[in-house]
């Protein structure tokens, strides 16, 4: 599309993309592999090679060196905020070289020395760029000092200038003043080059939102990726767009600018829900039971996102029973005989749930929701990235056995039988 519009492109094909995307772009099944991602481990690199066998051949014909519009290729993504294994970066580069990449490479990291040292390949003459959203003078000066340390007189570029920010559940929508943003962008372009992140807001469709790591609590991000960008989620110009346009006109009056295209959007009204059905009523039409002695995680059952229902039967040993879900993630709803008894979230999971036992044999259902895997930082390989129940469920002091497990990715509603009971 960019080529058709006469635009050049900078492509960032790393298997890790961050981008507030589920698991930073990695497939969930990698969590079953026992490998250390973003390292030089053979198992991981073999998977990257398989991925590049498909992806890179789609990129090669579009390189500038082949008459296309791709100017540069990124090696990894903010690797200096994760590791410092130079052999890994070289391996990623070599995998792309072996498959026909001929345009220049670059790296992008935070603009301070620690991340630049850890994540760059400056001694191999691979362009170093920085990611930031303000204080261009300070950040470019830091990058210049790093360049000088290595004897480089290189151009300065902010590869990700954060003109807005992503949003998380339970938090206020992040706002940024349009005029302040325009002045911050001016500070960048007077010293170097800029790539706005994001220029056009978007959507993390379905269950593909990412999650932020904060200590023992993870903070799921919302589905919208509007980001407060100059073009909003619908593709229409915002106040930021016009503020940037005005700044460019005042700073670079010779640059020709055109009025942006706009499109009509739908007025949001109440949308009535026509169909409804109980999950328990339609369970057998949307999923097949996987029988196991103990609960398995979502990943071990071959599922990546959505929900998973664990079902078993328990005997009445007392008028009230103490139940506990051991090592579950992210949100757990416990039902006894299809009646909700408790909802627990993240660190609450594992606390005692005292339930009345009305009959000799009781049906126990535990519905677990994957609310998004961490996409950035130190918890990419944490146990909490594995969703569902990791250890088991206890009644009194013993683990309950003999479970039916129902995978509920809910990627389609075609098999939902809405004629059944609500």
Model-derived features: positions:
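The substrate-binding groove and active-site-proximal loops of carbohydrate-active enzymes
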Residues: 1, 30-50, 74-85, 127-136, ...
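Aromatic- and carboxylate-lined catalytic core of secreted/periplasmic carbohydrate-active enzymes
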Residues: 221-281
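Aromatic-lined ligand-binding clefts that engage carbohydrates, nucleic acids, or primary amines
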Residues: 320-336, 364
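Catalytic-core region of carbohydrate-active enzymes that cleave or remodel glycosidic bonds
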Residues: 7, 98-99, 135-232, 236, ...
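An acidic-aromatic loop/edge-strand motif
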Residues: 15-17, 28-33, 55-56, 232, ...
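Active-site mouth of glycoside hydrolases
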Residues: 1-103
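Substrate-binding cleft/loops of secretory-pathway carbohydrate-active enzymes
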Residues: 80-101, 107-147, 170-173, 202-210
